[in-house]
Amino acid sequence: MIEGGHTRLSRTSHAISYDEKNDEILVPNPLAEAVLVYRGDASGDAAPIRAIQGPHTLIRDNDELALDNVHDELIVPTRESILIFSRTANGDIAPLRIIGGPKTRIYRARGIAVDPVNNIIAIGNSNPPGILIFNRTDQGDVAPRSMITGPKTGIYTTKGFAVVPERKELIATVEARGVQVSRNVGESFVGVWNYSDNGDVAPKAAIKGETTLLIAPRGAALDNKHQEIFVIDKVQNAFFTYSWEKLLQGQQR
């Protein structure tokens, strides 16, 4: 457990990433507008080995992050932009690249994933509600290569992402309107889309329904070895495991 004043952690962090290649733990701190990096074996009141923080970083509202350890880059979504830093960035340092501007359609980005093999970055968007997909090397005020949005998508707000590079598929957790108040089971879902999807496209497969026990799904991760998908639920305060193979076969709805 990493805890204590020297950690520079605040009361909440909504994401975490483990860099297996370099044995490091990366955590966003939205209240401090920072990204904190710890040694993989850090424990107790351990100070971060690096911290990206300061006015030159342009970091704000940074609930999530994504790590690309193929190209040694760290990707941070903010309210109206995507910031790309060197993985080893430290201190008050400017991003290597910024994807931002009216053409990007980015507004209150929530959830992010990077596929360094197929060179895409996917983020959840609040307005229009949906998923924006950019080329990994995009920079400046560029339009997304595709935008998944519309009533058929079922998207009210996206929260977490995972990618399947070999199949060029994107997994997204989707929270339904008002479920944190109503506590209704089965309205939110986990959807699967192709990278090539564009416009008002329904998910090709979904984990949805009362038997899923989902209320407010957040993070998602895929275990390729055991063909399982893991989903965290905020309201249920639970960690669910589903069959990835059955989902793709259309048996799990």
Stretches with model-predicted labels:
Residues 27, 76, 123, 172-173, ...:
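Residue position within the beta-strands of beta-propeller blades
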Residues 174-187, 242:
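Short, conserved, GDST-rich strand-edge loop motifs in beta-rich repeat architectures
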Residues 30, 40, 79, 87, ...:
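Short loop/turn segments immediately following the C-termini of beta-strands
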Residues 5-21, 55-73, 102-118, 151-168, ...:
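Beta-rich, blade/repeat-based domains predominating
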Residues 219-253:
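Blade-level signature of beta-propeller repeat domains, shared across WD40, Kelch, NHL, RCC1
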Residues 38-45, 84-92, 133-142, 192-200, ...:
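Short loop/turn segments immediately following beta-strands, especially the blade-tip
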Residues 32-34, 46, 81, 93, ...:
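A detector of repeated loop/turn-to-beta-strand junctions in beta-rich toroidal repeat architectures
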